[in-house]
C-alpha cells in the first residue's frame, strides 16, 4: 500500500529540512476547475509530490486546488512537467515563484480535502464563480493606480494589510474572507460607477471576489493577475515602478516577502517601526503579532509578561493550564479583536 500521509514527527521533519544542503524554491499556485473525486485526486497528487520530495500545504475541493509548496531546485522542472500532465486543466498553469526565498518555507507535506479551497460562505446557487473580472498585468496595475476613477480593494486579512499594501488601497475590516465578501459589496454601493480593482497575495481570493462583485451588479471589475507576487515580479523584470508599499505577508515559515524598503507597520508592544510577524512562544497562546528585536529579547518572544511567565513554567504545569482552556479557533485565531484584546491595541473602527 502506498504511503498517503506523513508518519514522522514535526520536530524530526523540521530538523531534516534544516539539514538539507540542496536549495529549494517556494512556489504557489491555484486553479478553479471541477474535480469530480477530490479524495482520489488528493491521493494521486500526494504520491506524485512525495516522489519529488515536495513539502508544503495543499487544499483540494470540488472547485479546484490551492497550493503553497517548497520544491528542491533540481526537481522544479520535473514537478512542472508532471503537474501539467496530471490534468488538462492544469496544463500551462501559472506558478508563482517566491520573491524573497530562503528555501526554508516548509518542512512537511500536508494535503487535505476541503469543502472549498477558499472558505467563502457563499451558498447562492445562482453564483457563477467562473464569471470573473478582467485580469490586470503589472503595467496596467500602475496605470489604474493613477486613475482617479479606480478603487483598489485589498481582499486579505488585517495582519496582511498592516505590513504592506498598494497605495491608497481600501482595507475591508473583517476577520475572514467570508465576512469580507458581503462587506465589500456594502462598502462599494455608493461607488458603483468606479472601476474596482481587487487584489490578494497570489490571486485566489481576489479572483473569486471579482466574480462575487459582478454577481452583485458591479460591472467595472478587475483583479491583479497572479496577485501581489506576480505583480512585483513582473514589475521588476520590466523595470516598472513597484507601487506596492512594504512587505507581502505569506503563510509559511518566512511570514513575509520584502517588496519595498518602506516599513509601514509598528511593533505591537513598543510602537517602534517594525513589520516582522511572529507567534507568541507561549504554547497556550501563539498569538500572531508584530514584535521588534528589542521586545523579542525583553519578552522572550512572548506577547505579554503573563505569557512570558507562563512559558517559563515547567512543561507539566503549562500543559495543566492549557487543559483548562478552550482551544481551537477561540484561542489560536488571528482575529483583530483577539490581537487588540491581548495587547491593548485600540480598534481602528472605534
Swiss-Prot record:
Residues 314-350 are annotated as: Disordered. GO terms for molecular function: oxidoreductase activity, acting on paired donors, with incorporation or reduction of molecular oxygen. The keyword tRNA processing applies. One of its GO terms (biological process) is tRNA modification. InterPro entries: Rhodanese-like_dom (IPR001763), Rhodanese-like_dom_sf (IPR036873), Rhodanese_C (IPR022111), TrhO (IPR020936), TRHO_N (IPR040503). It catalyses: uridine(34) in tRNA + AH2 + O2 = 5-hydroxyuridine(34) in tRNA + A + H2O. Its EC number is 1.14.-.-. This is tRNA uridine(34) hydroxylase. It comes from Citrobacter koseri (strain ATCC BAA-895 / CDC 4225-83 / SGSC4696). The lineage of its organism: Bacteria, Pseudomonadati, Pseudomonadota, Gammaproteobacteria, Enterobacterales.
Amino acid at each position: 500500500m502506498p504511503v498517503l500521509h506523513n508518519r514522522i514527527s514535526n520536530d524530526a521533519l523540521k530538523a531534516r529540512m534544516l539539514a538539507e544542503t540542496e536549495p529549494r524554491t517556494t512556489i504557489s499556485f491555484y486553479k478553479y476547475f471541477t474535480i469530480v473525486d477530490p479524495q482520489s485526486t488528493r491521493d494521486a497528487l500526494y504520491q506524485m509530490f512525495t516522489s519529488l520530495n515536495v513539502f508544503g500545504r495543499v487544499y483540494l475541493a470540488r472547485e479546484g486546488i490551492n497550493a503553497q509548496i517548497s520544491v528542491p531546485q533540481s526537481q522544479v522542472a520535473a514537478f512542472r512537467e508532471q503537474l501539467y500532465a496530471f490534468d488538462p486543466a492544469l496544463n500551462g498553469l501559472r506558478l508563482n515563484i517566491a520573491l524573497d526565498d530562503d528555501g526554508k518555507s516548509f518542512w512537511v507535506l500536508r494535503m487535505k480535502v476541503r469543502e472549498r479551497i477558499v472558505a467563502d460562505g457563499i451558498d447562492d446557487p445562482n453564483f457563477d464563480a467562473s464569471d470573473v473580472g478582467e485580469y490586470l498585468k503589472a503595467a496596467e496595475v500602475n496605470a489604474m493606480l493613477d486613475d482617479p476613477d479606480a478603487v483598489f480593494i485589498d481582499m486579505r486579512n488585517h495582519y496582511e494589510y498592516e505590513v504592506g499594501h498598494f497605495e491608497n488601497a481600501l482595507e475591508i475590516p473583517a476577520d475572514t474572507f467570508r465576512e469580507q465578501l458581503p462587506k465589500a459589496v456594502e462598502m462599494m454601493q455608493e461607488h458603483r460607477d468606479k472601476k474596482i480593482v481587487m487584489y490578494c497575495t497570489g490571486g485566489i481570493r481576489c479572483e473569486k471576489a471579482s466574480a462575487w462583485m459582478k454577481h452583485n451588479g458591479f460591472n467595472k471589475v478587475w483583479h491583479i493577475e497572479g496577485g501581489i507576487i506576480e505583480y512585483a515580479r513582473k514589475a521588476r523584470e520590466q523595470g516598472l515602478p513597484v507601487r506596492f508599499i512594504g512587505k507581502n505577508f505569506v503563510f509559511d515559515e518566512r511570514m513575509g516577502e520584502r517588496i519595498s524598503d518602506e516599513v509601514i507597520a509598528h511593533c505591537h508592544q513598543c510602537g517602534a517601526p517594525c513589520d516582522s510577524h511572529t507567534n507568541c512562544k507561549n504554547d497556550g497562546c501563539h498569538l500572531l503579532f508584530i514584535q521588534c528585536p528589542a521586545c523579542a529579547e525583553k519578552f522572550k518572544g512572548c506577547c505579554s509578561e503573563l505569557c512570558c511567565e507562563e512559558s517559563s513554567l515547567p512543561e507539566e504545569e503549562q500543559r495543566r493550564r492549557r487543559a483548562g482552556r478552550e482551544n481551537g479557533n477561540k484561542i489560536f485565531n488571528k482575529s483583530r479583536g483577539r490581537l487588540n484584546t491581548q495587547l491593548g491595541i485600540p480598534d481602528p473602527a472605534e
